[in-house]
Amino acid sequence: MVAPVIPALNDSEIERILDAAAHAGVKEASYVLLRLPLEVRDLFREWLMANYPDRYRHIFTLIRDMRGGRDYDSQWGTRMKGTGPMAWMIGRRFEIACEKLGLNKRRSKLTTDHFARPKRSGQQLSLF
């Protein structure tokens, strides 16, 4: 998992992270764009201003461009990857790097072979 991807701050490291992961034996990879729910938004702003004040406005402009003009998008289907040209570009870079490294060729299939139905119907099972 490459996360969080922060535009104009660490998105340039996607390929290097995936390369290191592939060399370590990883077969599947995914990414998540930076998410800024209310609980962390102000903390991230303070950290960014303290550590990268010259990039603050640019990074937040890109984040808002990928989040429909807001700092955070909670919508299913867009909250992890974002929307718009920059989100598309980050997604394509990730996909191309995965293809070059042979990642995500085959997704593991979920199996129910080891699932066993509870023996007692209607009663709560014991914890011990």
Task: Report the location of each language-model feature.
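Auxiliary Fe-S-binding modules of radical SAM enzymes
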Residues: 12-128
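A cross-domain feature marking catalytic cores of carbohydrate-active enzymes
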Residues: 2-4, 33
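Short, contiguous strand/loop micro-motifs
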Residues: 4-5, 81
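Acidic-and-aromatic substrate-binding clefts and catalytic sites of carbohydrate-active enzymes
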Residues: 6-11
